[in-house]
Design a protein with these regions (language model features):
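Short, amphipathic alpha-helical "recognition" segments used to contact nucleic acids or chromatin
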Residues: 1-9, 49-52
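Mobile-element integrase/transposase regions
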Residues: 74, 82, 86-143, 164-169, ...
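Single conserved hydrophobic/aromatic residue that forms the stacking wall/gate
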Residues: 300, 306-309
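Basic, flexible linker segments flanking DNA-binding modules
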Residues: 16, 23-121, 216, 271-281
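A short acidic/small-residue loop/turn micro-motif
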Residues: 146-147, 157-162
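Mobile genetic element proteins and their domesticated derivatives, centered on retroelements
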Residues: 16, 26, 48, 64, ...
Length: 309
């Protein structure tokens, strides 16, 4: 405490008097050699700063702890990471505000019923559209997410939201995955998703269309969660000048950061890409209802070449 006050410019004698400490005792304390525990904490604080920078300033203490213990094999506790971050003035971005939504009216079959958990790839894909303004006008992004690995497997960006936008995102996912028949593609009741061309694209790939309740975002909560993360970690962090600038940033966020570097709490802090690879290679072990661990080496978070902001 006194050290921090003195470093901030406060007189030593004033700090000692206010805190009831003798100046002689304080100076004896200052002359003591730094303990091994304190040296380790300083070292960990430096690593925490590097990880926080590499995450574009988005990681809180849980993901930083995962990066230290899983990515770097450094044993430490969640609490220690939280304490060191607080002392160093490092913090993650605040989470989304949870809003209770009113129940809407169902107008089409919902094959998911808010049960998004899947243990195999390509059993369930969820898709949706988000928008964000630039000085040139809005940018619309459609994405397709695999419910098992949380990986974005298809996406498309345009200056208008129409059926072509969502079909392009779905087409990218189908070409990348070549799914077996019987998988489900789940969306909301936007006109782009209920259009003939989109539902026909689903059926022609041997997949089944599914639509949540009208007006209830919880029926597509997994996709809403991804959009919320992207809003907090990318879109809302600056004012975007051009559509090209924002398009490039979304591309980097999805393909470089989210899929390959960002650790996901529901995947036991694996990245979607690593979890996807492990599922494909069938190197997972399942224990009861607990989500299985990834049996491949984790990708270590590296410093970004281009910051988002």
């Amino acid at each position: 405490m006194i050290d921090r006050l003195v470093d901030a410019g406060a007189p030593v004698h004033t700090c000692c008097r206010l805190l009831g400490v003798s100046r002689q005792g304080y100076y004896r304390y200052r002359k003591r050699p730094t303990s091994a525990t304190e040296l380790r904490r300083r070292w960990l604080t430096g690593l925490i700063r590097e990880i926080h920078i590499a995450s574009r300033g988005t990681y809180g203490y849980r993901r930083i702890h995962a990066e230290l213990t899983i990515g770097m094999n450094i044993p430490c506790s969640n609490r220690l990471v939280s304490v060191l971050m607080t002392r160093a003035g490092i913090g993650g971005l605040p989470g989304p505000v949870r809003i209770k939504r009113l129940k809407g009216v169902a107008t089409a079959d919902d094959l998911v019923n808010r049960k998004f958990h899947r243990l195999a790839l390509n059993e369930l894909w969820v898709t949706d559209i988000t928008e964000h303004p630039t000085r040139e006008g809005k940018v619309y992004c459609a994405a397709v997410l695999d419910a098992c690995s949380r990986k974005i497997i298809g996406w498309a960006i345009d200056s208008k939201q129409d059926s072509t936008l969502v079909v392009n995102a779905l087409d990218m996912a189908i070409r990348a995955r070549q799914p077996a028949p019987g998988g489900v593609v789940h969306a909301d009741h936007g006109v782009q998703f209920t259009s003939w061309v989109f539902t026909q694209k689903i059926r022609s790939a041997g997949l089944l269309p599914s639509f949540g309740t009208v007006g209830d975002g919880l029926d597509n909560a997994m996709m809403e969660s991804f959009w919320s993360s992207m809003q907090i970690e990318l879109l809302n962090r600056k004012k975007w000048k051009t559509r090209v600038e924002l398009t490039n940033a979304i591309f980097e966020y999805i393909e470089v950061f989210y899929n390959r570097r960002r650790r996901h709490s529901s995947l036991e802090y694996a990245t979607p890409h690593d979890y996807d690879l492990a599922r494909t290679a069938r190197t997972l072990t399942t224990t009861g209802s607990k989500r299985p661990r990834v049996g491949v080496s984790y990708t270590h978070l590296t410093l970004p070449t281009t910051p988002y902001v």
